[in-house]
Amino acid sequence: MGMGEPLLNYKNVIKALHYITSEEGLNMSYKRVTLSTSGITKMIKKLADDKVKVNLALSLHSVSEETREKIMPVGKSNSLIELRDSLKYYFSKTKKKVTYEYVLLRDINDSLEDAKKLYKFTKHMPSKINLIEYNEVYSLKFQKSTEEKTKIFMDYLEKSGVNVNLRRSRGKDIN
């Protein structure tokens, strides 16, 4: 996993993907390569148009415009409607399902209502949702969701037929 938004460095990301997947490079299958993005809508469409068939992971974290803009500045310039449309476009061109990354933050995006909105946002095409336990940083205002709310959130998605995983925080014992 690298740092920064890869789709804002498109030309070099495409070069890197070519190296990773070419015989002269690492010779990995595109099926084993995942590109993680915060959701630059026009570049997601460009990936599809350029026939780049990588697995796409979207850092979503909220399906409320207001909340997403607060926790992810990219939300201010890429609306959820535009984002959903670009992901549908990507799927229609590549037939690759999208993985949604969703960090559960206590009392910010972890309610049953948030789970219902997430399901509604993702149900239009095959996808997977990775719920991520927040790794608390004491100098930040965010807290991880409670076990009870996490279970309710995940149970709702599972009962709705969503392919969902919970990624637990690791390294809690490290100072």
What are these regions (language model features)?
Residues L131, L166-R168:
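A structural preference for short, hydrophobic beta-strand core positions in alpha/beta folds
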Residues L60, R168-R170:
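Residues at the C-termini of beta-strands that transition into short coil/loop
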Residues K159-G161, G171-N175:
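Radical SAM enzyme core and accessory elements
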Residues G2-S160:
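Conserved AdoMet/S-adenosylmethionine-binding subsite of the radical SAM
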Residues S29, N165-L166:
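Short, hydrophobic secondary-structure boundary micro-motifs
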